[in-house]
């Protein structure tokens, strides 16, 4: 089989600014971020039909990593208490998974429920309807699993 090429959706100007165009959008019933009920949310990720062939073979995986842009996030923090909880340490934004980041890029590893054409259905994606999708990658334990990962004790207090 021959490689099928496509055009990049990103670019960088001479000043170093990066532009990224989404390859699709999320479609679900969530209108605003909510905690903690993400585990039951089913989302359709609708990919631009130009990239449908890029999904071929994804059905063989049980989980995918979704990269998306949190376009509805209105605040940018440098330090805070995660989830606004003062019983959690006051930490830097890069020491937590909160959405109030300088670059509103997010990633989530989720269960792949199925695929039909240019649409993949996933479960437990913490995303709002209409959120731009930047990339989809298969979850592969050989690359993504970290054995004996160390995390602070306060993480177990967070609501997921």
Where are these regions (language model features)?
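Cys-His-centered catalytic/binding microenvironment captured across papain-like cysteine peptidases
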Residues: 1-107, 114-160
